[in-house]
């Protein structure tokens, strides 16, 4: 912790992925890589957080930046590095109404393993697409959400998002 809202720290990662029951017609998607992937990485992250309540923020901002290196000397079959950023903002727009926005990106330098490429989709990212529906070397997305409190612990939300994966 570097201040009231500012954090800096190390990143240590170990990722394990195993593909099984793969149809031979889709083996080309693995680009000649092993169906079992282990990735080890080291790096650093910085975070700035002024949100009033982490799990259901109504005001403040959250910013995150990390850089992770996965070199071959750590035992990785694929040497690459990953830069990730996330920026979120929350603002009250009227009684019970919260406008939330998010911008997120992931960029790989080098040759990431099939298990570590950038993805779009899932319950928190580009809802409506299953997790990993879109995959490539890099991804960027933006989402905007309007939350309205209705009664007690009940509310409604409308949201829109756009994103892209690219090489």
Regions found by a protein language model. Name each.
Residues 1-38, 43, 120-124, 133-137:
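Gram-negative/organellar outer-membrane beta-barrel architecture
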Residues 35, 42-152, 156-167:
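C-terminal outer-membrane beta-barrel translocator/porin domains of Gram-negative envelope proteins
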